[in-house]
């Protein structure tokens, strides 16, 4: 191989090759007669000075790993291949100088790699891990820069250096990324060039369509170590992807959908990040820098690495906007504080937990100074924006949920501005939730709003008694909330001690019933009667109940007992037997009224009363029967002769020969939508209706200890008989059925107290078909 000094265009050759040629020319003085046809992966030490040596051929043995790379049919050929460098002669006979054996060996290696590359275009990628970089330079497996080889055999004696063209469209960029990511997923080690996607264009690309589903799964595959600097992701969708150790510097992520996207250990400095409103879940940043990056007001920054800001100007946004600093990050603010802007930027309760308040607060506590500084800038903006009280009202809860907590309470500026906001928030809570249950407190409410309400009651102690419905609910949820801290519970317990010492409350707790029976609460058990609600109308009336009872009455189920409390007047326990729960709740304790009525509407016993006692024919009697269902005991008795005769006249047509008439039976099935139901389902309903009429005939309602209306006893027994015919399996036994039947009629010496029968049947129904019983039996009787 002869090298000529006149056939090389130096303007197109990388510096390494230029240095190599220059060195050869300097040492050969008068030039070489051979030409370089190809140079590949030449070690950088070739730039050292060439030394003179022998002009005899130099042989180079192939490394074993290169031999093993080829198929067996190639090994025999390659084992015989020797690269000979010969006829490198100095045309200056006066000063023959040859290249040293060391440098010739290096050239041998370069030419050998060229020979191998001509047999497999994948050699460079599979063996050395090298990939082209700009200018034809690559990084080899030992991380040293080399000259990129040609992928095809040389076609001319001139030096050939191949350049790699960039993709021309977002689709091409997406294809290139898919290829690189899949190679990485397969376990291949990518070079820096393989992972270089700087200046890429991914606009409008939905990544879930170009990557396998495993990249979108929780704890799935990761896009790791890629360089996306100065790239465009506008209108793309990178949702559910995890980028680790990636670089996004100066990239544009405008209107990008990044729901639940994770950025970890990444460089996102100087990024324009405005994700789309269709982003459902916030992206997360873990050990990621965001210097001078524009962040929307709905981001979670819990894992961001924050630094001191520089003197950079705010970013330029086409739609305009104001900005505040959060460390070295820029947060976008509205141009004007309108009601819509306040709702969009501040109301995280209305925006799935997202707001600028939550964004700032999401930073860890080690950045408390930066958080306070940013919140002060936000408050100044709100103060200068001159929003009206009506404009602030919808976001008061969101504001106090953040600003009424440390570290922001340390700021005099924030506290001064927030004071009136918190007062209005508290007044609204008292007005709204004194007479209705609070929403079931979630983690957010327990940790952010309950402490604010405790603080407000502490500042305004009179509200404890004037709004005891709300106050007791707040204490209840503080003591039972699984997400409440010990500090919250301790403050709640201390505040309740103040409440119990109030003159309107203290007379009711020294009766041997309250708490631990000595006038103080017992918070070690939920069964203790620790809670005392004052009547909203009569200061002399109070209700005492346990934690469990209060919880279930505020959030009832069909099985909730509505009489498991003490009713106190002047501190003394009074009977509720003849008090209608609905009237008691409406007049004195309205906090339970809505829940009670909601449960009452699900009880359908009244439909049978309307069938038997139509309001047109029996209006007064209908009202008496309905009114009796609203209390445990009735003062109205129907055992006088006139009443007995009237009832007999009404029920006789329904009970020919003591059994339900077919027509009346069909009316019942129709009223309770049982026409197509199974016999067992029909039997369960009739059994529960029988239980209710047994209660009607007992001393608790229309009967006495010694007498009861025969028509009601007979009707109750007829309902039970029909249930037995339909499905004997729903009864405890045939003996129990016979016993109940005898008691209804006083046969065979059976004890005829229908209160006992009603209680026994009710217990059985509650055990074996409780949902049917709960849909029929009046609440006051339950």
From Swiss-Prot:
- Report one GO cellular component: host cell
Q: Which GO terms describe its molecular function?
A: ubiquitin-protein transferase activity
Enzymatic reactions: S-ubiquitinyl-[E2 ubiquitin-conjugating enzyme]-L-cysteine + [acceptor protein]-L-lysine = [E2 ubiquitin-conjugating enzyme]-L-cysteine + N(6)-ubiquitinyl-[acceptor protein]-L-lysine
Q: Which GO terms describe its biological process?
A: protein ubiquitination
According to the lineage, what is the superkingdom?
Answer: Bacteria
One Pfam family, please name it: SopA_C
Family matches, as InterPro entries? SopA-like_cat (IPR025725), SopA-like_catalytic_sf (IPR038270), SopA-like_central (IPR025726)
Keywords tagged on the record: Secreted, Transferase, Ubl conjugation, Ubl conjugation pathway, Virulence
Compositional bias of kind Low complexity: 157-171
After translation, how is this protein modified?
Ubiquitinated in the presence of host E1 ubiquitin-activating enzyme, E2 ubiquitin-conjugating enzyme and ubiquitin.
**EC assignment:** 2.3.2.26
**What are the coiled-coil residue ranges?**
none
| Annotated segments matching region Disordered | 137-171
Q: What is annotated as the active site? A: 753 (glycyl thioester intermediate)
Q: Spell out the subcellular localization from the entry.
A: Secreted; Host cell
Q: Does Hydrolase count among this protein's keywords?
A: no
Protein task: Effector proteins function to alter host cell physiology and promote bacterial survival in host tissues. This protein is an E3 ubiquitin ligase that interferes with host's ubiquitination pathway.
Similarity remark: Belongs to the SopA E3 ligase family.
Designated name of the protein: E3 ubiquitin-protein ligase SopA
Q: Which organism is it from?
A: Salmonella heidelberg (strain SL476)
């Amino acid at each position: 191989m002869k090298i000529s000094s006149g056939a090389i265009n130096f303007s197109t050759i990388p510096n390494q090759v230029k240095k190599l040629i220059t060195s050869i020319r300097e040492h050969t003085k008068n030039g070489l007669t051979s030409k370089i046809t190809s140079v590949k992966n030449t070690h950088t030490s070739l730039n050292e000075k060439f030394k003179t040596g022998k002009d005899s051929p130099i042989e180079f043995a192939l490394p074993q790993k290169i031999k093993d790379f080829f198929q067996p049919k190639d090994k025999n050929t390659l084992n015989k291949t020797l690269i000979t460098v010969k006829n490198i002669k100095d045309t200056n006979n006066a000063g023959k100088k040859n290249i040293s054996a060391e440098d010739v060996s290096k050239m041998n290696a370069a030419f050998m790699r060229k020979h191998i590359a001509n047999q497999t275009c994948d050699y460079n990628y599979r063996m050395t891990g090298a990939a082209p970089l700009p200018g034809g330079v690559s990084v080899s497996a030992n991380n040293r820069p080399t000259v990129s080889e040609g992928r095809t055999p040389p076609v001319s004696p001139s030096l050939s250096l191949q350049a790699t063209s960039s993709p021309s469209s977002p689709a091409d960029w997406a294809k290139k990324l898919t290829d690189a990511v899949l190679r990485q997923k397969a376990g291949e080690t990518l070079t820096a060039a393989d992972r270089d996607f700087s200046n890429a264009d991914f606009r409008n690309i939905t990544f879930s369509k170009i990557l396998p589903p495993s990249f979108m799964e929780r704890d799935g595959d990761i896009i790791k170590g890629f360089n996306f600097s100065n790239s465009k992701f506008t209108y793309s969708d990178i949702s559910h992807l995890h980028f680790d150790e990636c670089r996004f510097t100066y990239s544009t992520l405008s209107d990008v959908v990044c729901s639940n996207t994770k950025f970890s250990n990444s460089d996102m400095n100087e990024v324009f990040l405005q994700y789309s409103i269709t982003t459902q879940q916030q992206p997360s940043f873990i050990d990621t820098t965001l210097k001078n990056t524009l962040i929307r007001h709905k981001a979670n920054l819990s894992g961001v690495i924050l630094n001191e800001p520089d003197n950079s100007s705010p970013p330029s946004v086409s739609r305009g906007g104001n900005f505040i600093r959060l460390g070295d990050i820029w947060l976008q603010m509205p141009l004007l504080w309108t009601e819509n802007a306040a709702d969009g930027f501040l109301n995280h309760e209305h925006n799935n937990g997202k707001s600028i308040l939550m964004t700032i607060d999401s930073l860890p506590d080690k950045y408390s100074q930066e958080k306070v500084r940013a919140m002060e800038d936000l408050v100044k903006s709100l103060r200068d924006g001159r929003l009206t009280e009506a404009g602030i009202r919808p976001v008061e809860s969101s504001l106090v949920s953040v600003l009424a907590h440390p570290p922001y309470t340390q700021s005099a500026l924030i506290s001064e501005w927030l004071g009136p906001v918190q007062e209005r928030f508290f007044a609204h809570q008292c007005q709204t939730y004194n007479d209705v249950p609070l929403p079931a407190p979630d983690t957010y409410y327990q940790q952010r709003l309950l402490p604010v309400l405790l603080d407000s009651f502490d500042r305004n102690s009179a509200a404890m008694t004037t709004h005891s419905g709300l106050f007791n609910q707040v204490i209840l949820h503080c003591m039972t909330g699984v997400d409440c801290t010990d500090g919250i519970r301790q403050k709640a317990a201390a505040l309740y001690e103040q409440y119990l010492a109030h003159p309107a409350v203290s007379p009711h707790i020294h009766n041997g019933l309250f708490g631990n029976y000595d006038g103080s609460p017992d918070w070690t058990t939920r069964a203790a009667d620790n809670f005392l609600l004052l009547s909203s109308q009569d200061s002399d009336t109070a209700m005492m109940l346990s934690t469990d009872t209060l919880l279930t009455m505020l959030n009832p189920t069909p099985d909730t007992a509505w009489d498991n409390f003490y009713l106190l007047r002047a501190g003394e326990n009074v009977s509720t037997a003849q008090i209608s729960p609905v009237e008691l709740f409406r007049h004195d304790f309205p906090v339970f009224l809505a829940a009670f009525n909601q449960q009452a509407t699900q009880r359908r016993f009244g439909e049978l009363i309307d069938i038997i006692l139509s309001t047109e024919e029996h209006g007064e009697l209908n009202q008496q029967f309905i009114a009796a269902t609203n209390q445990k005991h009735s003062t109205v008795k129907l055992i006088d002769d006139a009443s007995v005769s009237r009832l007999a006249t009404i029920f006789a047509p329904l009970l020919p020969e003591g059994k339900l008439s077919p027509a009346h039976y069909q009316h019942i099935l129709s009223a309770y939508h049982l026409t197509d139901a199974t016999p067992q389902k029909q039997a369960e309903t009739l059994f529960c209706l029988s239980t209710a009429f047994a209660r009607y005939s007992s001393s608790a309602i229309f009967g006495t200890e010694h007498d009861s209306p025969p028509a009601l006893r007979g009707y109750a027994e007829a309902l039970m008989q029909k249930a037995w015919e339909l499905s004997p399996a729903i009864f405890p036994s045939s003996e129990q059925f016979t016993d109940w039947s005898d008691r209804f009629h006083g046969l065979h010496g059976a004890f005829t107290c229908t209160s006992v029968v009603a209680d026994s049947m009710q217990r059985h129904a509650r055990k074996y078909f409780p949902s049917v019983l709960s849909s029929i039996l009046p609440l006051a009787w339950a």
